[in-house]
Amino acid sequence: MRNKKFLLPVIFSILVMFSLASCKSPVSVNIVNDNTEGETVSKATDREEKDEDDVKKHEKKNKDNKKLINTSGKPHILLKDTMELHNDDESSTTLYRIKYVYLQLKEDGKEFEPLKKSFENYNKDLLDKLSKTREAFDGFAKEQLSDIQQGYESKELFSETDSYIMRADKYAVSILNYTKYNYGASDKYSRESINFDTDTGKKLEFLDVVKDDKSFFEMADKRVYEDYEEIHIQKPSEYAYTSKKNNYENLVWTVSPVGVTVYFDSGVLGAETDGPQVITISFDENETIFEPKYVYKENEYVIPVVAGNMTIHVDTDGDGVRDSVFVDDLYEQNPETLDIYNTGMKVYAGTQSIEIECYEGKAYLVKMDGNYYMYMFVQDEIRLLYCLDLKYLKSEDRSDKYFYLGTREGTWDQKGEIENYVSIEETFTDTESFVGEYFGDLGILFPIEKEWFVGEDGTPQSSDDKGRVTSGIAFRTLKDIKCTEVDREGKVKKSDTKIVKGTLILPLYANDKEYMDVITVDEDDLNIWNGAGEEFFSLTNMKLLDYEGDFYRITFENDDGDLSIDGTDIFDLFEGIITAG
């Protein structure tokens, strides 16, 4: 059970989450084996040279800091996470919560119109399912209220779905929905999937991708006893025999860059106590059993690794033998309350493993330049990315950054006893282009959103000099601030101007170390609250995030991460800087 506060407005949660107290910009640490000091320095130098080459290569694509035009034919997907809380004000109780995810397509091109239409139909079907879920929960909630009125302790009911984009390229889009739910007895899990042909938007059936299903399930029989050798369950091929009569309508499956994965919930192949089974058959194990169109042919890829029971078999160390790669959640139990909560995640690659402390996270397997990496986007006190080289997983050194996948926007509203939290999340499906929020030296003020790519050394790189500020954090100037006036591209229009004391400013662009581009805003555009003897400001007029006019550029002096203007510390210049601790 995750320790989360569901009753805080999401805007405030986002601001606090992004807060950093006295944090310096981290150094990206090289992941190396047990080498001598000289060898380590040599590897570090090679990495820096590779990074520079990677950035130069991408700078040609992204000149003048303009948004990259999608020429790859790959769709990029946004996830619209929505959380509903149904409360009873009289008893101050949350009766139930429902979390669900809509699909949105970032691209507007005509070639993506069929896929966009399929997403719209998917979202409509989701609304119908939600209506039935609410109806069921309303019935359970009446029992909850009755228990509360009689003095019994109530348990919050919930249904929470996380969506994973297993593949999104010019041939296929594959989505896995993982739902955790409790209708009053105990926590349970279920999975659903849907797969699309990118060109036509057509929903793919299992036999559209796996043309020799008999051979596929024979391989699955062998794999299930490799990955789940300690349990005695029905063979996947026996289950498939009955499922084929309905054209595998009830089979949960996805297609990824690695291969095709089938998912069996607890109780399907065995007893409830046997847990679920997730089996992946790779394309390169027997390419002939798959439809050629959907066999992934590129050398680089990224796929999500769902923590708990998904195992992928790849050769991580180049010895010609496939290694089992998987991720597990780590838990502890409070001895008094018996509540179970996350304490971290553990990554396995063959005989190697490593633990990472966090209370939640997402894992992605990345293949780049013949090597395998695990990207661990985790959240503890702050959000971090650990980039783990699976060849050297036992190494003490780990490459980490104050980095996370981007959040487009977050909103909260309340109607009667129902609260709604909405956030639009970026996804990581393309090694050539993904959006992430990074804390540079200006991280004490806000995160910076940039377009990134995976470099040849496996770490995220960006050719953008500056990025967007989408957190909606605003400040009030405590003194006159000298600045320059610039246009959208950063060309100076007026070199000597100032923002007067008492002005409300909203940062919209910034680079990692030196400057932020701001606009002035009115109090009507903001939510203003008091705390610790000062006021804090967050944006409510979200249209301002899309402003494209001229800006005031405020330039800082940067002394190893300590920011000032003409020797005056930023805390004496701006009101509303949120810090932790």
Regions found by a protein language model. Give the residues of each.
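Acidic, glycine-anchored loop motifs typical of Ca2+
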Residues: A307, T311-Q333, K367-M374, P460
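C-terminal motif of bacterial Sec signal peptides marking the signal peptidase cleavage site
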Residues: S19-S22
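A short beta-strand motif characteristic of beta-propeller blades
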Residues: T351-E357
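Hydrophobic helical h-region of N-terminal Sec-dependent signal peptides
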Residues: V10-V16
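Short, flexible beta-strand-to-coil junctions
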Residues: Y178-Y183, F264-G270, V327-N334, Y341-G344, ...
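Compositionally biased intrinsically disordered regions enriched in Thr/Gly
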Residues: K24-R47, D51-T316, L330, G361, ...
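Bacterial N-terminal signal peptides that target proteins for export
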Residues: M1-V10
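Acidic, small-residue rich beta-repeat scaffolds with periodic aromatic anchors
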Residues: D54-N87, V255-G308, L390-G581
